Amino acid sequence: MTDSANNRPPRLPRREVHGVLLLDKPLGLSSNDALVRAKRLLRALKAGHTGTLDPLATGLLPLCFGEATKFSQDLLDADKTYEAVVRLGQKTTTGDAEGEVVVERPVSCDRAGLDAAIARFLGEIDQVPPMHSALKKDGRPLYEYARAGQTVERPARRVTIHAIDVLDCALPLAPSFTMRVKCSKGTYIRTLAEDIGEALGCGAHLTGLRRIAVGDLTLDGAVTLDQIDAQADEARPAMLAPVDALLRRCPPVTLSAEAMSRFLQGQRLAYRDLDPDSAPQEGVLARVYGGEPPKLLGVARMREGALRPERLVRL
């Protein structure tokens, strides 16, 4: 064993960490690499991300740790909000600034024309995923076909564009604009930018993309990997939001000690076992608390007059 190996500080053991890290992902880092680095910095036993963010995009990447991973699917299904910078008049091989320009056309539209084109993409639309994406065909990611110079048929997918707001527009002086897009899961902003360019007759590609919200989670309070690294090891878990930050839309229900014991055994609770002032409506998913001080026990849904556990957490 070398002297350097002998002098290396011992690796600290993994630990139980529960909560949601609101990570501001940097440019050029994949979501998986960001997760690996955050998990190492926190020394967490269990972690998972809530949907990928392209390496060329920055912004909000919620990472779930410990018991929060039980709710990661909810964020996968949540609406997303992005800010995107679009360059008109040029199409690239990848739909973004990393690709080669393959088509160049004059840009003759003004702000009114841009607004009219954007309006065509509001609501439910059919969108063909880009070749440079991680979607798979015959077990292979589409980007592998694209890198080999192949184009394969991709079925259009139905997505919903809830809102598009133009934040900045250089037209007609310069061929670019910035938009904020709120959309359903599975929406490709790169493709949306290209489609807007086609609607204007000039083509387009993305030059910048930043995610600013996932469901109710925003960049407010988000941290970078460098900020985590700068903290003392024992202070890092405090940088996570609590597990119930993922459940803000669910009304709270607090149980008595007796009801809590039954709930944690997976038993349903009759309406009479609940505080009538906080009992949820039929069909509503609630976040359930118990103990002193109250802590999150899980989520449950009111069905046929009884509160039925759906997911339990052990904090």
UniProtKB/Swiss-Prot annotation:
InterPro entries: PsdUridine_synth_cat_dom_sf, PsdUridine_synth_N, PUA-like_sf, PUA_sf, tRNA_psdUridine_synth_TruB, tRNA_sdUridine_synth_fam1_C, TruB_C. The active site is at D54. Keywords: Isomerase, tRNA processing. Its EC number is 5.4.99.25. It comes from the Bacteria. GO terms for molecular function: RNA binding; tRNA pseudouridine(55) synthase activity. GO terms for biological process: mRNA pseudouridine synthesis; tRNA pseudouridine synthesis. It is an enzyme of class 5 (isomerase). Pfam families: TruB-C_2, TruB_C_2, TruB_N. It catalyses: uridine(55) in tRNA = pseudouridine(55) in tRNA. The keyword Acyltransferase does not apply. The keyword tRNA processing applies. Belongs to the pseudouridine synthase TruB family. Type 1 subfamily. Responsible for synthesis of pseudouridine from uracil-55 in the psi GC loop of transfer RNAs. PANTHER family: PSEUDOURIDYLATE SYNTHASE TRUB1 (PTHR13767:SF2), TRNA-PSEUDOURIDINE SYNTHASE (PTHR13767). This is tRNA pseudouridine synthase B. The gene is truB.
